[in-house]
Regions:
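Interaction/scaffold regions that mediate signaling and macromolecular assembly across diverse proteins
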Residues: 1-223
Length: 223
């Protein structure tokens, strides 16, 4: 049986992508009971599914309604279980297990609310960073995340993103990757782990290559 809350998250993302009215669905989110949400999202796969879909839906909704740039990530406009969250709360508090936005992922923020701590994942999955930026991919292969196949979806979106956003300079032996991999380096396991990830995806030996980071901006790419 499908999980009610992940199904609701799938629906609101689908409607937001079509730029249709999401207010009835947002009302349902607001009146969810925290105890039921916590009990229902009892695995990391369910948590990742629900919160990635909610994040991407409200990214689109907030961008459309406010017409703002980078400020949208701090705006408290996401009303769930009578709590009000920002995109940053979901990304860094829930999906990154209450980390500071800065600090490369090495510093935990003890000041997040009990609401966020109750709903946070038990283990950080570096692939969520690609899932939260998947709306900006030129070629989109995933309509929404589904808890029954989320492992495969996260692997797919990671592979797609890296193939599209990574540049090789064979002459200088350098690889340019999006700078959010540096910003959240600990989530990826460090610089060596980033290189191993690239080696797996491109199926080649990159030990003689240097990694360089290029600016990546979600808002500018969507506007």
């Amino acid at each position: 049986m499908k999980n009610y809350y992940t199904t609701l998250s799938e629906e609101i993302l689908s409607v937001a992508k079509l730029e249709k009215d999401t207010i009835p669905l947002r009302r349902q989110l607001f009146y969810i009971r925290l105890s039921k949400l916590e009990k229902s999202l009892d695995t990391d796969d369910l948590k990742k599914t629900f919160w990635i879909n909610i994040y991407n839906a409200f990214y689109l909704i907030t961008l459309k309604e406010t017409k703002q740039g980078k400020e949208i990530f701090n705006l408290k406009r996401i009303k769930i279980a009578r709590a009000i969250l920002s995109l940053n709360d979901i990304e860094h508090g829930i999906l990154r297990k209450y980390k500071f936005r800065i600090g490369y992922g090495y510093i935990t923020n003890p000041f997040y609310s009990d609401f966020i701590k109750k709903l946070a994942v038990s283990k950080v999955d570096y692939r969520i960073h690609f899932a939260l930026r998947s709306l900006n991919l030129a070629q989109k292969t995933i309509d929404y995340f589904d808890s029954e196949v989320i492992e495969e979806q996260l692997t797919t979106v990671t592979t797609d993103f890296i193939h599209l956003e990574t540049e090789f300079d064979e002459e200088s032996k350098t690889i340019q990757v999006s700078d959010f991999l540096l910003s959240y380096l600990k989530d990826f396991g460090g610089k060596n782990s980033v290189k191993k990830l690239l080696e797996r995806i491109f199926e080649r030996d990159l030990k003689n290559y240097k990694i360089r980071f290029k600016t990546y901006n979600r808002v500018e790419k969507l506007l």
